[in-house]
Swiss-Prot record:
Binding site residues for Mg(2+) 1: 111, 557
Subunit organization: Monomer. Part of the FGAM synthase complex composed of 1 PurL, 1 PurQ and 2 PurS subunits.
Listed Gene3D superfamilies: PurM-like C-terminal domain, PurM-like, N-terminal domain
Gene from which this protein is expressed: purL
Family as reported in the entry's similarity comment: Belongs to the FGAMS family.
Role, per record: Part of the phosphoribosylformylglycinamidine synthase complex involved in the purines biosynthetic pathway. Catalyzes the ATP-dependent conversion of formylglycinamide ribonucleotide (FGAR) and glutamine to yield formylglycinamidine ribonucleotide (FGAM) and glutamate. The FGAM synthase complex is composed of three subunits. PurQ produces an ammonia molecule by converting glutamine to glutamate. PurL transfers the ammonia molecule to FGAR to form FGAM in an ATP-dependent manner.
GO biological process, one term: 'de novo' IMP biosynthetic process
Active site location: 62, 113
NCBIfam families per the UniProt record, alphabetical: FGAM_synth_II, PRK01213.1
Gene Ontology MF terms in the entry: ATP binding; magnesium ion binding; phosphoribosylformylglycinamidine synthase activity
Name the UniProt record assigns to this protein: Phosphoribosylformylglycinamidine synthase subunit PurL
Entry's localization field: Cytoplasm
Length: 772
């Protein structure tokens, strides 16, 4: 027998029982010795190679949430009946589903594809988009938009440009080919992400209530069908290796093939699925992402009648040399698995044939409570599917208060030199405007199609993306994502609250009512007790804040092992907030459109410069405590903004966050090129702050709005009645010359042309022409 033939000898269940002492490469597959011992105990024998492959990917950190599960339960525990009222599907499914009225529902979710995007930036990012879109399809929805949250290393590092070009082009390629508008997100640069970029992709879809589908395999005798792209060798072990281990300082030491995406195949798959749903041909459905067939079969069986029989050799292959174990672990893209009644199978196959989507019947649902997999007539797996998909190991990792955090918090920004003169304030405002993190991101966003589909109401650079759902009524949704790793490094509990508060505020500023949350929790190694302390604090803070704001977490993702060597990233919980708007015609943009309107600052300004963009940009400083979170004030502000938009009292709204008032003013000016005259004296007098804090503080629960003069009295009355401090700080104005100007009275003035030049040049100068 040749070596090649020997490699393909099938390890059957009978053989596993007969050879209990055979050594197996469990460690190479990411399993710990005690986990391997648990598998043997569950099975009463050693696992077959196929079973070992299944357990290794499904018990990985990425799939099992074994280090985070004990904390994530808080999201399901800290809820009220009112929070559940409009929640059709919560955590545990492929994506959350929210009732938005008129028989419509929205499903949305954010997930990470961090490690693959470092190994192969283009394909890693592209397949991140494809994977999250399939989660949306699997709920019975039509995907209608995507967003992304990106974190890269220092902007001036040569490797950063390579990763940025690949990631952005991968996202734009896949999303644009699918015909999905990319309506928002954030991009930040920091050396802490140098060896570990974050690529978090969000997708959102719409569906009628009656079209909702879930991932379960119910109905003994129903057929299990795999359809979509053929199965290849790409992504094998991705969940257990790429997403569940750290990178060494020299780069990734384990390099399984990153998945390869085909957006045109996915576009056809979307339309095929929607027709199958319309014709009511699907009983249950699951997309194939992390862990591939291992995940789809075990999860469908666990959530249904508990049993399934699969003929693995019926899987259509791109590479006929793949072993059974490789087929089980493959993460080839653009694949779905459906459960179909036998009497509807011919109709199902006719629809997939119409769309030229390759389809194979793999097996059927059984009532045995076992997942049995055969390979060329021999049994290679016989497991309780719940032990694979649900009842995996759960760890309560050691938690330790970081040894360095007290010193970091003691190093407050209050000791930093503040600008006093008008010239110094002007110089520093421009420095922030042109800094890597606050500069215009159109070099990135212009590679995305914002308006494909014709239903985009708001997109970059507005505070939230907004999509019209119903053409007749104007019903729509808004969505915003936010994160601030610098705040979380100072205080992960308060930092997570701040991320939620900003996304909540952004949605409210668009005119929508915040309704639900998704999150992607990006952290270092869970084997580091200090990282686990950060994680536990962030989850506690986020769950507490959701409860106080009255909006439920519908699902999301945890991404651990984001570190290079022993250096973890900043804790970076990404929070997405979905809001509902009854008519997108009432949407509010984040910039001034008309001259002669009054500019109001809503909320109170405090001397809060710790962790700020000003401290980082001007002084290279990180220390102290993040801004105080006042969720009651956030709620009052959101309700006021919504009421003002409904009554037509405001023509623009922009939240205050990174860069404070200075950044919000310049972005509002640049949105439509309308200048402004602003005075800071009343802020200083009322709030007791100096000019620098008035401009650069990042105090929360604040926004600036523009109000037509004829609505001024009504608007003031609205704010007074709702307990929201409102201070008139300026007017929109063309300026005395031919060029619009942003004038901070008695301090400085900057022409809009200069603001635009500074704001737009940073990324283009650093990254050059768009590649591809």
């Amino acid at each position: 027998m040749t070596d090649t033939t020997a490699q393909h000898v099938v390890d059957t269940v009978a053989n596993a029982a007969a050879t209990p002492e055979r050594e197996q490469p469990f460690a190479a597959l990411g399993l710990k010795p005690d986990e391997y011992a648990s598998i043997r105990e569950i099975l009463g024998r050693r696992p077959t190679n196929g079973e070992l492959a299944m357990y290794s990917v499904m018990w990985s950190e990425h799939c099992s949430y074994k280090s985070s599960k004990i904390y994530l339960r808080q999201f399901g525990q800290k809820v009220t009946p009112a929070m559940k009222k409009n929640l059709m599907v919560g955590m545990g499914e492929n994506a959350g589903v929210v009732d938005i009225g008129e028989g419509w529902a929205v499903t949305f979710k954010v997930e990470s594809h961090n490690h693959p995007s470092y190994i192969e930036p283009f394909q890693g990012a592209a397949t991140g988009v494809g994977g999250i879109v399939r989660d949306i399809i699997s709920m019975g929805a039509r995907p209608v938009a995507v967003m992304d949250q990106l974190r890269f290393g220092a902007i001036d590092e040569p490797d950063t440009a390579h990763v940025v070009h690949g990631v952005v082009s991968g996202i734009s390629f896949y999303g644009n080919c699918l015909g999905l508008p990319n309506i928002g997100g954030e991009t930040y640069f920091d050396p802490v992400y140098q060896g570990n970029p974050l690529v978090n992709a969000l997708s959102v879809g719409v569906l009628r209530h009656e079209d909702l589908h879930l991932a379960n395999a119910s109905g003994v005798g129903n057929k299990v069908v795999l359809f979509g792209a053929r199965t290849g060798g790409d992504g094998i072990g991705g969940a257990s290796i790429l997403a569940s281990d750290t990178f060494s300082e020299g780069g990734p030491t384990k390099r399984p093939a990153v998945q390869v995406g085909d957006p045109f195949a996915e576009k056809v798959l979307i339309e095929c699925c929607l027709e199958l749903y319309r014709d009511k041909l699907v009983e249950g459905i699951q997309d194939l992402g992390a862990a591939g067939i291992s995940c789809a079969t075990s999860e469908l069986a666990s959530n249904g009648d508990g049993g399934m029989f699969i003929e693995l050799d019926s899987v259509l292959l791109r590479d006929p040399s793949l072993t059974a174990e490789e087929i089980l672990m493959s993460e080839s893209q653009e694949r779905m698995m459906a459960v179909v009644k036998p009497e509807l199978l011919d109709q199902f196959l006719a629809v997939t044939a119409k769309w030229d989507v390759e389809t194979s019947v793999l097996g059927e649902v059984t009532g045995t409570g076992r997942l049995v997999i055969n390979w060329h007539g021999e049994e290679i797996a016989n497991v309780d599917p719940r032990t694979v998909a649900i009842d995996g190991p759960v760890y309560e990792r050691p938690v330790a208060y970081p040894s360095w955090i007290d010193a970091l918090r003691a190093d407050s920004a209050s000791a930093l030199a503040l600008p006093v003169s008008g010239d110094a304030l002007r110089e520093q405002a421009l420095a922030l405007l042109g800094s890597a993190n606050l500069a215009d991101k159109s070099w990135i966003t212009d590679q995305y199609d914002y308006f494909v589909g014709g239903n985009t109401a708001l997109a970059f650079p507005d505070d939230a993306g907004m999509i019209r759902v119903d053409e007749e009524s104007g019903l729509g949704f808004a969505i915003a994502t936010d994160a601030n790793g610098r705040y979380c490094q100072l205080d992960p509990k308060e930092g997570a609250k701040l991320a939620l508060a900003e996304a909540y505020r952004n949605v409210a500023a668009s005119g929508a009512v915040p309704a639900a949350v998704t999150d992607c929790l990006n952290f270092g190694s869970p084997e580091n007790p200090e990282v686990m302390w950060q994680f536990s604090q962030a989850v506690e803070g986020l769950s507490d804040a959701c409860l106080e704001l009255g909006i439920p977490v519908t699902g999301g993702n945890v991404s651990f092992y984001n570190q290079t060597g022993d250096v973890p990233i900043f804790p970076t919980p990404v929070v997405g907030v979905l809001g509902v708007i009854d008519d997108v015609a009432r949407r509010i943009p984040a910039g001034w459109q008309d001259e002669g309107e009054n500019i109001y600052l809503l909320g109170i300004t405090r001397e809060e410069l710790d962790g700020s963009a000003w401290a980082a940009t001007v002084h290279g400083h990180l220390g102290g405590r993040p801004p105080a979170v006042d969720l009651a004030a956030e709620r009052r502000l959101a309700e006021t903004l919504h009421a003002a938009s409904q009554q037509g009292l405001i023509s623009s709204a922009h939240d205050l966050a990174d860069g404070g008032l200075a950044q919000a003013l310049t972005e509002s000016v640049l949105r439509f090129g309308v200048g402004a005259r602003v005075w800071l004296g009343d802020i200083a007098e009322r709030d007791g702050v100096d000019a620098a804090s008035a401009l650069f503080s990042e105090s929360t629960a604040r926004a600036i709005v523009s109000v037509p003069r004829e609505d001024d009295v009504k608007f003031r009355g609205l704010c007074d009645g709702r307990g929201v401090p409102a201070l008139r700080i300026g007017v929109t104005d063309a300026g005395a010359g031919t060029e619009p100007v942003l004038e901070i009275q008695d301090l400085f003035a900057i022409e809009v042309a200069e603001l635009r030049s500074v704001h737009r040049s940073t990324l283009a100068e650093r990254f050059g022409p768009v590649v591809g």
